[in-house]
C-alpha cells in the first residue's frame, strides 16, 4: 500500500473567555492514527508550541507515527476579544487550537454623583469623589449637561473633553 501523506483528521478544542496574556494548553490530546504501517510524517507547529507524547513543549520540527499524542500551547492575546491560533501540521493534515480572550467590560457598577440643590448662580460646584468599579482595561469617560460641566479622574486635571478611567479610579464632576 502507498504511504499516507496525512493522518486521520484531528483537531483541538477551542477555548473562549480566557484571561489576557495567559499561558494556555489545549484541553484535549490528539492521537495520530490512520497512517500506513511504517509511515512517518513530518510535524511542524506555527503560532505556539506542542507537547509530543507528554514531553516538554517545543516549537522544533519533529516526526510522528501512529499512536503518538500531541497537545498544543500558546500565550493568549494581550487584547480583549482577540483570538490566538496555534496550528499543528502533520504531513499535509492540520489541526488548530484557538483561544479567544474575554470581552472588555465597559459598564461599571452603578454609581451616583450627588445633586446640588439651591445652587447659587455662577457658582462652581464639585461632586464628592466616587469610586468606579467592575470595569476592565481603560474605558472612555465623557461629561455633558448645562453649565460647561467638567470631569476629573483621580488627581488628574479637570476636563470637558473625553478622558479615560480604569477600575477603582475615583471620578468627580
Indicate where each model-derived feature is located.
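Solvent-exposed, low-complexity, repeat-rich "mucin-like" stalks and linkers
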Residues: 6-42, 109-142
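A short beta-strand micro-motif common to beta-rich folds, especially ectodomain repeats
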Residues: 81-92
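Short beta-strand/loop motifs in extracellular/secreted proteins, especially
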Residues: 39-41, 46-48, 84, 137-141, ...
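Short, solvent-exposed loop/linker segments at beta-strand-coil boundaries, enriched for Pro/Gly
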Residues: 45-56, 145-157
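Extracellular interdomain linker/stem segments of modular secreted and single-pass surface proteins
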Residues: 2-5, 101-108
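Extracellular/luminal low-complexity segments enriched in Ser/Thr/Pro
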Residues: 69-81, 170-173
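Short proline/glycine- and polar residue-rich coil/turn motifs
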Residues: 61-68, 163-167
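Edge beta-strands of extracellular beta-sandwich domains
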Residues: 93-102
Amino acid at each position: 500500500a502507498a504511504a499516507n501523506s496525512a493522518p486521520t483528521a484531528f483537531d483541538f478544542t477551542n477555548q473562549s473567555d480566557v484571561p489576557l496574556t495567559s499561558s494556555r494548553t489545549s484541553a484535549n490530546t490528539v492521537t495520530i492514527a490512520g497512517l500506513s504501517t511504517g509511515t512517518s510524517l513530518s510535524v511542524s507547529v506555527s503560532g505556539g508550541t506542542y507537547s509530543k507524547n507528554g514531553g516538554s513543549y517545543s516549537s522544533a520540527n519533529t516526526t510522528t507515527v501512529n499512536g503518538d499524542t500531541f497537545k498544543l500551547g500558546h500565550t493568549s492575546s494581550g487584547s480583549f476579544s482577540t483570538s490566538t491560533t496555534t496550528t499543528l501540521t502533520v504531513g499535509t493534515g492540520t489541526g488548530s487550537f484557538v483561544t479567544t480572550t474575554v470581552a472588555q467590560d465597559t459598564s461599571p457598577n452603578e454609581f451616583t454623583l450627588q445633586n446640588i440643590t439651591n445652587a447659587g448662580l455662577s457658582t462652581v460646584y464639585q461632586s464628592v469623589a466616587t469610586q468606579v468599579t467592575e470595569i476592565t482595561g481603560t474605558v472612555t469617560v465623557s461629561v455633558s449637561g448645562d453649565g460647561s460641566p467638567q470631569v476629573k479622574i483621580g488627581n488628574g486635571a479637570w476636563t470637558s473633553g473625553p478622558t479615560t478611567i480604569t477600575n477603582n479610579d475615583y471620578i468627580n464632576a
